[in-house]
């Protein structure tokens, strides 16, 4: 199974986007957005050192590789406290 950043990277690769491999680098390279401006396709980042990333799918939900036991899951975006939102979409 993919880890969180690998999952996001492979989803974006399907649409021709090349993202960095790790969550912190994905955040650094993204266009920052305010949480209130979040749009479908944005990335939501978690953890003090940006240790986790999820893909926003609308209606307050994200899809992400939670951990090796749970695999790919859909949860509320605020299942944990988001520390940032980034976009790769034009």
Q: Could you tell me what each predicted segment is?
A:
Residues 3, 51-52:
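Short loop/turn microsegments at loop-to-beta-strand junctions
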């Amino acid at each position: 199974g993919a880890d969180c950043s690998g999952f996001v990277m492979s989803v974006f690769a399907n649409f021709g986007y090349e993202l960095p491999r790790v969550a912190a680098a994905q955040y650094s390279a993204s266009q920052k957005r305010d949480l209130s401006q979040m749009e479908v396709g944005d990335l939501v980042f978690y953890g003090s050192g940006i240790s986790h990333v999820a893909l926003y799918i609308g209606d307050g939900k994200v899809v992400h590789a939670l951990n090796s036991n749970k695999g790919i899951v859909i949860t509320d975006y605020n299942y944990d406290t988001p520390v940032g939102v980034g976009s790769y979409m034009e």
